[in-house]
Amino acid sequence: MDIDPYKEFGASTELISFLPADFFPSVRDLLDTAAALYREALESPEHCSHHHTALRQAILCWGELMTLATWVGNNLQDPASRDLVVNYVNTNMGLKIRQLLWFHISCLTFGRETVLEYLVSFGVWIRTPPAYRPPNAPILSTLPETTVVRRRGRSPRRRTPSPRRRRSQSPRRRRSQSRESQC
């Protein structure tokens, strides 16, 4: 069977594969991030979202894989065979788990649409010949689409605001999630 774990989320293994292997943090860092941001929701018996469910499953699979790897490591007498197994797990399965964890943590953190736009932007950037693309890759961020970033040197900015211009009294709009309810 050819199962794509990203299909129901609007992405694909092919789209994720545009990101180089060294882009993804270590499994340990991703697990720590998931625990720090979403522990309550992940441990909750309530259904929060499909991303929470997928994240739970990826974490459980990694735990089982580590149990198996430990057993194999303890029971294989031949060091060369043991090294082959460890390298295979780290190279192949480790990368797949890192990709899954990153995708679902990013979707929960930034929103699925933002992550999908980022993957498409990065895919276009990486496939553009170096001579024709900007030097820096796109960056996944929480900037809203309406934000305008001005380039340096276009028009000089005033150092002080005009006396007629008043600062807004309303607090800045923030994209925030209460830590109490992660769902």
Curated annotation (Swiss-Prot):
GO MF annotations, alphabetized: DNA binding; RNA binding; structural molecule activity
Top-level division of the source organism's lineage:
Viruses
Q: Where is this region: RNA binding?
A: 177-183
What keywords tag this UniProt record?
Capsid protein, Cytoplasmic inwards viral transport, DNA-binding, Host cytoplasm, Host-virus interaction, Microtubular inwards viral transport, Phosphoprotein, Repeat, RNA-binding, T=4 icosahedral capsid protein, Viral penetration into host nucleus, Virion, Virus entry into host cell
Q: Which InterPro entries match?
A: Hepatitis_core, Viral_capsid_core_dom_sf_HBV
The segment annotated 3 X 8 AA repeats of S-P-R-R-R-[PR]-S-Q runs over: 155-177
Primary localization class, coarse = virion
Tell me the Gene Ontology biological-process terms attached to this UniProt entry. microtubule-dependent intracellular transport of viral material towards nucleus; symbiont entry into host cell; viral penetration into host nucleus
Q: Where is this motif: Bipartite nuclear localization signal?
A: 158-175
- Where, per the database record, does this protein carry Phosphoserine? 155, 162, 170
A Pfam family hit: Hepatitis_core
Q: How is it modified after translation?
A: Phosphorylated by host SRPK1, SRPK2, and maybe protein kinase C or GAPDH. Phosphorylation is critical for pregenomic RNA packaging. Protein kinase C phosphorylation is stimulated by HBx protein and may play a role in transport of the viral genome to the nucleus at the late step during the viral replication cycle.
What are the annotated GO cellular component locations?
host cell; host cell cytoplasm; T=4 icosahedral viral capsid
Question: What are the ranges of the sequence repeats?
Answer: 155-161, 162-169, 170-177
Function according to Swiss-Prot or TrEMBL: Self assembles to form an icosahedral capsid. Most capsids appear to be large particles with an icosahedral symmetry of T=4 and consist of 240 copies of capsid protein, though a fraction forms smaller T=3 particles consisting of 180 capsid proteins. Entering capsids are transported along microtubules to the nucleus. Phosphorylation of the capsid is thought to induce exposure of nuclear localization signal in the C-terminal portion of the capsid protein that allows binding to the nuclear pore complex via the importin (karyopherin-) alpha and beta.
Binding partners and assembly:
Homodimerizes, then multimerizes. Interacts with cytosol exposed regions of viral L glycoprotein present in the reticulum-to-Golgi compartment. Interacts with human FLNB. Phosphorylated form interacts with host importin alpha; this interaction depends on the exposure of the NLS, which itself depends upon genome maturation and/or phosphorylation of the capsid protein. Interacts with host NUP153.
UniProt lists the family membership as follows:
Belongs to the orthohepadnavirus core antigen family.
What's the name of the protein? Capsid protein
Which gene holds the coding sequence for this protein? C
